[in-house]
């Protein structure tokens, strides 16, 4: 299947527009699964039927995380506004959840990283319920059952592409609500364990 079929599914609006859409789902208790599309997951879709189905599913919200995705859409004359990075989206969603006193589950990264992020969130938003588990468990599906039991409002999974997306997809039917997003290495940045590149380099992917 041509890459352009996946690109047609990508959200065309601004980062702010998408944050409003995701924030509405968070506030109203809707279910929203977000996939941050970069060249890696688009290429993997060519050889993986599960990823292909996920990207083409009308229920999946796909955003352009990667300047090359934005440029490819422009070359194909597909509507697109700007790059929407996973780390920016994760930060906005966490802030929205904190302000609304929603519950959050963080899965992935090293213990010291994910625990530092959880502590940081609790300090900033004392009324937000934060649960977490590192990404080194041998049975990720068993780990995810803990999330199913908790039924949180926001779930961030940092296990890398495409493992994080496929894991969420396998269990999504067990949730009545929640915003779900795979965030790759974002916990390192969000926790303060790793500095992020200046905004100019993020926007231009240089």
Each language-model region and where it sits:
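Structural motif
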Residues: 61, 103, 153-154, 179
